[in-house]
């Protein structure tokens, strides 16, 4: 039987993280890097993702590369596996973190229902759901060769729960229908992929609660009151779940939606 350090180790493995220049994507990259993984950061913001890779290399003395790409472009996604193989030689972990979220600035997004825009709905589905299917499809051959393949989809409690819109009254925040629908679809896609890519590749989701981004009152107090642990999440709160699902700690876990929300959904 392996010891705890061996089960947690990602030494020799390679992880690709979409949305890698963002707060959560980069935090997960750092966690996996500390466990020994090589890192591929994918993001549309070329300058920012390149700077993130420089930071990773400086801190952890590991192999890390950046890729600037539009994950809704089918041609760019098709070219991804070849680029990954050329740059890193393998792929063991795929984390789908890129997403349009409730605080994204889009036309007809975080607005009342009758004002929500159909084109923005379609864009959210492309980014939050369709891209995950396409990336899994293209990366599966490399993940299958790994023998330790793991896909982690970053979902949301709002893929499971209906929103309490009273949280947002009197604020500029909102909870778009497209966000909830795309994240609910992502959880079901996780189940579908888990049964179809097994036994070679495990597929799981992490449904996170609200992550603190300098939220102001009255939203902050309202959210804390609805959360048994009486606070919003930080990036650090998600890292244990990500490392667990990426490593052999979860070698017998697939098709699971791990909720990390401070108890928000426990009421």
Regions found by a protein language model. Give the residues of each.
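Conserved glycine-rich Rossmann-like NAD(P)H-binding loop of the short-chain dehydrogenase/reductase
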Residues: 37-52
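Short, small/polar-rich loop/turn modules that mediate ligand/substrate recognition or access, typified
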Residues: 95, 148, 198-202, 253-255
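C-terminal substrate-recognition "lid" of short-chain dehydrogenase/reductases
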Residues: 198, 231-266
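Amphipathic alpha-helical dimer-interface segment in Rossmann-like NAD(P)H-dependent oxidoreductases
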Residues: 82-85, 99, 123-145, 158-159, ...
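Canonical Rossmann dinucleotide-binding motif of NAD(H)/NADP(H)-dependent dehydrogenases/reductases
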Residues: 7-40, 193
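Catalytic Tyr-X3-Lys loop
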Residues: 92, 100, 114-133, 148, ...
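Conserved mid-core segment of classical short-chain dehydrogenase/reductases
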Residues: 78, 100-122, 164-171, 215-218
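Catalytic loop of short-chain dehydrogenase/reductase
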Residues: 114-120, 144, 152-198, 210-211
